[in-house]
């Protein structure tokens, strides 16, 4: 059997991390099996679906490296196929028109609640005779189409994550609406559970991999597969992503959109790596840091957890820092340059920028940190409290004054590290303080603070653009 999986996002919002994690699991399984990863845009919600959300979803998947193997299917372009399937069910008496008004249905639900029962459709129009239907039609009533569900039916499947699953027809809330209201003898807009069955069959989907919040939908859809005589795929229901309190991650928890993570400075490699670990355990002896291609070689559903996966910011930050630390300086500069330009900085020559990227790389957690940490290299720094305190230490300014005098008398071809170290030693001796005092004071003068990357390299970079002497003079 050829493995064909699909991601089927609705363009009613930006690419959510839950949808992206589902995409990662689908992609990993397809690549591990030598199969195909497909994309279907479920845009049948006409009011909420927007082209800009489709663009955001596609761009987010591309950014993560989740390439798909065929042209994306646009669900709304296949509505005639969906209506044809509904008509087939009507013709076989496996579905029927329900004329109950919204007011009547709400009254039904309120009565059920008052009786302590779970709200469900009571199948009141399941067996209307022609005269009853004609009477409703003469009133001008519109109708939904409902799919018949036998309360005594048992729905079973072997879930690739959860094992054997069993549902009763009585658990599904009564006969299921499969199309919206429309005038009598017409079929309104087809609804989700019918539509995805028709589309998955048309796309020859072999495995449906999605979140556990779809388990009840799977039970309903299996009945539709059987009623339409369509081949039934295998199902895998992955765990939900949870917040720190153990509840489903939602917009109320803050950042959940992939484009937001991207804007915050997370790399595609770290995001894809982390999402792979949200609910999947790597085989023993396997490093938790990997590329998608590496993960695909060992991915299997027997290591996907049933329990929800808590979102761990610390782990994501660690993974992102490791990616940034290991990036070659040219690749890191490629990521940082647009951010530096956006900050309004005129960039010096390429080699200087490469050396700055290399200097900052080991201290970055997020790409945006590369803006904050680069700022004193492009802008005159403001002395922070710790910098001011350091410059007030006995001998600090005397040492810097001596260093400045030495620099005024020094002629070097480029910045010489050994010579720079000797100048610091000389300044410390002249001021009768430890060399560390001079080094801290120099850092305060150059960067405005005591925290920062390697001092000598920092000094060298600023010297190359003629900023070291200016900053020393400012502090004296």
From Swiss-Prot:
Q: Where is this motif: 'KMSKS' region?
A: 248-252
Q: Where in the cell is it found?
A: Cytoplasm
GO term, biological process aspect, one:
glutamyl-tRNA aminoacylation
Locus of motif 'HIGH' region: 9-19
Enzyme Commission code(s) on record: 6.1.1.17
The GO molecular function terms of this record are: ATP binding; glutamate-tRNA ligase activity; tRNA binding; zinc ion binding
Which Gene Ontology cellular-component terms appear in the entry? cytosol
According to its UniProt record, this protein's enzyme class is ligase
Catalytic activities: tRNA(Glu) + L-glutamate + ATP = L-glutamyl-tRNA(Glu) + AMP + diphosphate
For binding ATP, which residues are annotated in this chain's numbering?
251
What keywords are assigned to this protein?
Aminoacyl-tRNA synthetase, ATP-binding, Cytoplasm, Ligase, Nucleotide-binding, Protein biosynthesis
Listed under subunit, the entry gives:
Monomer.
So what family is this one in? Belongs to the class-I aminoacyl-tRNA synthetase family. Glutamate--tRNA ligase type 1 subfamily.
Matching PANTHER family: GLUTAMATE--TRNA LIGASE (PTHR43311), GLUTAMATE--TRNA LIGASE, MITOCHONDRIAL-RELATED (PTHR43311:SF2)
Instruction: Say what the protein does.
Output: Catalyzes the attachment of glutamate to tRNA(Glu) in a two-step reaction: glutamate is first activated by ATP to form Glu-AMP and then transferred to the acceptor end of tRNA(Glu).
Q: What HAMAP family does the database record attribute to this sequence?
A: Glu_tRNA_synth_type1 (MF_00022)
Spell out the protein name for this chain.
Glutamate--tRNA ligase
Species for this entry: Prochlorococcus marinus (strain MIT 9313)
């Amino acid at each position: 059997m050829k493995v064909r999986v699909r991601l089927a996002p609705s363009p009613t919002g930006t690419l959510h991390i839950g949808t992206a994690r589902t995409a990662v699991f689908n992609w990993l399984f397809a690549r591990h099996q030598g199969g195909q990863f497909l994309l279907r845009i479920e845009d049948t919600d006409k009011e909420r679906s927007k082209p800009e959300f489709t663009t955001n979803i596609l761009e987010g998947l591309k950014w993560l490296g989740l390439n798909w193997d065929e042209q994306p299917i646009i669900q709304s372009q296949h509505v005639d196929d969906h209506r044809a399937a509904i008509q087939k069910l009507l013709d076989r008496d496996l579905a029927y028109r329900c004329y109950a008004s919204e007011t009547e249905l709400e009254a039904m639900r309120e009565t059920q609640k008052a009786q302590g029962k779970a709200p469900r459709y009571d199948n009141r129009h399941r067996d209307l005779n022609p005269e009853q239907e004609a009477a409703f039609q003469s009133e001008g009533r519109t109708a939904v189409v409902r799919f018949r569900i036998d309360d005594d039916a048992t729905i079973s499947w072997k879930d690739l994550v959860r094992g054997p699953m069993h549902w009763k027809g009585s658990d599904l809330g009564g006969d299921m609406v499969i199309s919206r209201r429309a005038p009598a003898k017409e079929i309104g807009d087809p609804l989700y559970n019918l539509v995805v069955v028709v589309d998955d069959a048309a796309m020859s989907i072999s495995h449906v991999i999605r979140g556990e919040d779809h388990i009840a939908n799977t039970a309903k859809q299996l009945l539709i597969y059987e009623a339409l005589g369509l081949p039934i795929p295998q199902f895998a229901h992955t765990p939900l992503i949870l917040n720190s309190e153990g509840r489903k991650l939602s917009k109320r928890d803050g950042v959940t959109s992939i484009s937001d993570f991207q804007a915050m400075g997370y790399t595609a490699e770290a995001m894809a790596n982390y999402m792979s670990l949200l609910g999947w355990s790597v085989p023993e002896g396997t490093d938790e840091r990997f590329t998608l291609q590496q993960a695909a070689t060992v991915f299997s559903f027997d290591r996907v957890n049933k329990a929800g996966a808590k979102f761990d910011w610390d782990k994501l930050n660690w993974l992102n820092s490791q990616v940034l630390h290991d990036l070659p300086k040219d690749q890191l500069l490629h990521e940082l340059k647009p951010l530096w330009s956006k900050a309004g900085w005129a960039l010096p020559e390429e080699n200087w920028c490469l050396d700055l990227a290399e200097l900052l790389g080991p201290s970055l957690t997020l790409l945006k940190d590369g803006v904050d940490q680069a700022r004193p290299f492009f802008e005159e720094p403001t002395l922070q409290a710790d910098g001011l305190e350091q410059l007030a230490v006995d001998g600090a300014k005397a040492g810097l004054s001596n260093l400045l005098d030495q620099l005024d008398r020094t002629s070097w071809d480029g910045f010489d590290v050994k010579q720079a170290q000797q100048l610091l030693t000389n300044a410390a001796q002249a001021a009768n303080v430890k060399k560390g005092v001079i080094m801290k004071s120099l850092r305060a003068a150059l960067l405005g603070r005591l925290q920062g990357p390697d001092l000598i390299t920092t000094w060298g970079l600023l010297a190359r653009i003629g900023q070291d002497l200016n900053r020393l003079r400012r502090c004296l």
